[in-house]
Amino acid sequence: MDFFPMLSSLVSRCSAALALGAAAFFAPALQAAEKAFAPAIVYDFGGKFDRSFNQSASEGAEKFKKDTGVAFREFEITNAAQREQAMAQLAKRGASIIVAVGFTQASAVEKVAKQFPDVKFTIIDAVVDLPNVQSINFREQESSFLCGMAAALVSKTGKVGFVGGMDIPLIRKFALGYTEGVKFVNPAAEVFQNMTGTTPAAWGDPTKGAELAKSQFGRGADVIFHAAGATGIGVMQAAKDAGKLSIGCDSNQNYLHPGSVLTSAVKGVSVAVYKAFSDAKAGTWKPGQLFLGLAENGVDYSLDEFNRKLITPEIEAKLRQAKADIIAGKIKVTEYKAQ
């Protein structure tokens, strides 16, 4: 019997066995690496195509996917009970971070985060104090102040309006900052205010938004700022139809009605989502509270080709100076506090 063929065969079989053993040993590690990062996002009422708050969040998630090649799971709720259900299911399916868009998701985040302590949660526009939750909030009153200034600077009647969505402290922040900005320019100006409702349905009623806007226009307002989600689409359409001006909210809505949208109070929701996903992927994500204002580029007013003719160089200069003064602390914008 030839010794060398036998040795060669033995070596081959041993090598194969070692290879199989190594594969079996490393497979779980490789699988774990492949599953190491699985981001997810749960939108609030209105859905990711609301052309406002949720859409801005969606854009942040999509940008992350484009930049990194990492896909994300998402869920659009249609009723309140789905918040908790969706988050729990995403956590069970291996999500490593779940971004909850909107203050109404706070209770669901608090409950599910306790059930899944190893999953990271980021909530936008609310505070949940847990060791695995990051809370991102904005100083909406600062951008609203600038929008109020712009409204007062272009108003011919000295009367402007505000239409909010759900009557909650967050929307009162917008209203108060806006009013202070108006009064900063024209102390004698009138500011009409209406809230759409007291339930989440107030975010998705453009017909009601249009009705409220028409009422304010009828009282003499010639500029209306909305902070009402999809309801605000009706406000903006009513302004265009009446030959008046509107101010968008959350995302840059200038493009919706070029020449009719004075500006938009933009909020870095897309930035917040992108940052949450990116930090979690990089291992730099931290729980706790994060506040974003003008100084952090978290909020601002929008200026582009769609409203360039409405915001004159003189108006822009005044807004730029006010922005610098707010950042420097020379102008104090009141933050609404619930009584």
Where on the chain are the PLM-derived regions?
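Bacterial N-terminal signal peptides
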Residues: 9, 13-27
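A residue-level marker of the well-folded mature domains of exported/periplasmic proteins
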Residues: 33-339
